A protein has these predicted regions:
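Short, well-ordered beta-strand elements
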Residues: 264, 456-468, 472-476, 480, ...
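Gly/Ser-rich catalytic/binding loops embedded in alpha/beta enzyme cores
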Residues: 1-225, 243, 330
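Short glycine/serine-rich loop segments
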Residues: 155-279, 427, 438, 442-461
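Short, well-ordered beta-strand elements within core beta-sheets of diverse protein domains
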Residues: 62-69, 148-151, 260-267, 390-395, ...
């Protein structure tokens, strides 16, 4: 058709969304209002260790206490993490670019500000890594893919800019599975630090691997369908996938304009809360972001005040490590939770809505496909982006729109479920909740629930109501503090 030929001639940047903007709001839903409140756990005195590398696995909250008290400088922390990145990064294949000059300059500025009484908050002087789909104007942004390995985007992503304003120090741009699928990128396969014969999963492969290995204080990942949950499960990290529209994606690679979300990958739930506090909020550069929605977090929220549901059929059908998933419910009971059995909507064909993602991804990278530069992609198997992009050009527009209409029904039914409970605990890969909640835009916290017989971590997920990250994080924190699985770390050689 002449129409197609003419539109193909228009130069459309990857980030430009269609005129049809997605918002996950069910009918009659009122956005939360009021002031934000952030009440973290009471701080405990932290002593500088004799060997600074003993802080490699410390949570952000402990690092922040040391930096604020000026017992440790940001430059010292930054040099320590840069050294670990150089030492272990090649083995784990988790680094695309070390941003050492930028990092040392940011760290020196953080220390100078502290010396003059300027403290930007709990991320002041804390080193972190960013998934390399986030633009940073002084370095390449490769999207993990060979066709883009020399790409330079001369702007900072909003999240990068917000973290700089919070005083954080960018030490590395970390790997992602090429164009945000899996753990294979143009330079290799990112490894799981608990078992380096295995991949880290993805697509936030580097953020999870590097955080688990103590190479950064925290990291920023992204999720479209499992890309924070899956590598966090594999690597034993704690991740927050925020509500769709809570965190700006401006300056981030677009894969699915209606499903992409950015969030932190950390060592603790409270670290996720600290990072989320810094990066969330409205951004005119991303029209899907919401205005004036508060973030209310209270680390000491009584569990009895929260209606906690558990995804009964998914827990009942667990085959592997069932003793670990059952222990999650036991711990929650012991903390005073009155667990209510619930089920996610089962009458709609959730598993058959994946072509929403495939169609949007194919459109986002249509120029790559039509230019034949997709031949440069490392993975050319059936279930990898080059071939999925090619096949998805044959998805009829009518079917894409009809799938999104079914998605609207799914949003309404899930809203009904969250009228009965505030938080739902579920096996991370149980039933269809992972795809379902990515389609509906609900927030999720994934965290370790124990270790398999092979000594590798596995996880559980807590899902919250729309824009209710504060309560979700508080509940997940109560479980994490009681279970303590996050305190174990891999032994690197």
């Amino acid at each position: 058709s002449a129409n197609y030929v003419k539109t193909r001639g228009v130069d459309i940047p990857n980030s430009l969304a269609p005129a049809l903007l997605f918002h996950p709001l069910p009918k009659g839903f009122k956005l939360p209002s009021g002031p934000s409140r952030f009440r973290p756990s009471a701080s405990t005195p932290v002593v500088r260790p004799a060997d600074l590398e003993d802080l490699a696995f410390a949570p952000v909250t402990e690092l922040a206490a040391l930096v604020r008290a000026r017992r440790v400088t940001s430059v010292e922390l930054t040099r320590m993490y840069l050294e670990r990145l150089r030492r272990y990064g090649p083995m784990l294949q988790c680094i695309i670019t070390l941003t050492d000059s930028l990092a040392l300059a940011q760290a020196a500025r953080a220390d100078a500000e502290l010396a003059h009484g300027i403290y930007r908050g709990p991320l002041h002087g804390i080193p972190y890594g960013a998934k390399d789909l986030l633009a940073q104007k002084d370095h390449r942004t490769t999207w993990g893919a060979m066709p883009f390995k020399d790409q330079w985007i001369r702007e900072d992503a909003t999240v990068i800019r917000k973290l700089e304003a919070a005083g954080a120090v960018l030490v590395a741009k970390l790997t992602l599975g090429a164009l945000a699928w899996g753990d294979v990128w143009y330079g290799g396969t990112t490894k799981n630090p608990w078992d380096t014969t295995k991949g880290s999963s993805g697509s936030s492969a580097g953020p999870a691997s590097a955080t688990a290995a103590g190479l950064v204080g925290f990291a920023i990942g992204s999720e479209t369908w499992g890309s924070i949950v899956s590598p966090s499960d594999r690597c034993g990290t704690t991740g927050l996938r925020p509500t769709f529209g809570r965190v700006s994606r401006a300056g981030a690679m677009a894969l699915s304009w209606s499903m992409d979300k950015l969030g932190p990958i950390c060592r603790t739930v409270e670290d996720c809360a600290v990072v989320f506090q810094a990066i969330h909020g409205y951004d005119p550069s991303d029209p899907t972001t919401v205005r004036d929605v508060p973030f209310v977090y209270d680390a000491n929220l009584p569990l009895r005040s929260v209606r906690v549901g558990y995804y009964r059929s998914a827990f009942d059908s667990v085959k592997q490590n069932k003793h670990l998933s059952d222990s999650v419910l036991t711990v929650l009971h012991s903390l005073g939770a009155d667990l209510v059995p619930v089920e996610f909507p089962a009458d709609l064909p959730v598993d058959h809505l994946t072509h929403i993602l495939s169609a949007e991804a194919a459109a986002a990278f249509d120029d790559l496909t039509r230019s034949n530069r997709d031949d440069l992609m490392v993975r050319q198997i059936k279930n990898a982006w080059p071939n999925v992009f090619r096949a998805s050009r044959f998805i009829p527009a009518v079917e894409y729109l009809q799938a999104n209409r079914v998605r609207t029904l799914l949003i309404e039914e899930t809203a009904e479920l969250f009228r009965t409970v505030d938080v739902i605990v579920a096996p991370s890969f149980g039933g269809n909740q992972l795809l379902l909640t990515n389609l509906t835009g609900h927030p999720c916290v994934v965290l370790p629930m124990g270790f398999t017989d092979r000594g590798t971590p596995t996880s559980v997920s807590f899902i919250g109501g729309l824009y209710d990250e504060g309560r979700l994080l508080a509940v997940a924190k109560r479980y994490q503090d009681a279970s303590g699985h996050h305190r174990r770390h891999p032994a690197l050689r």
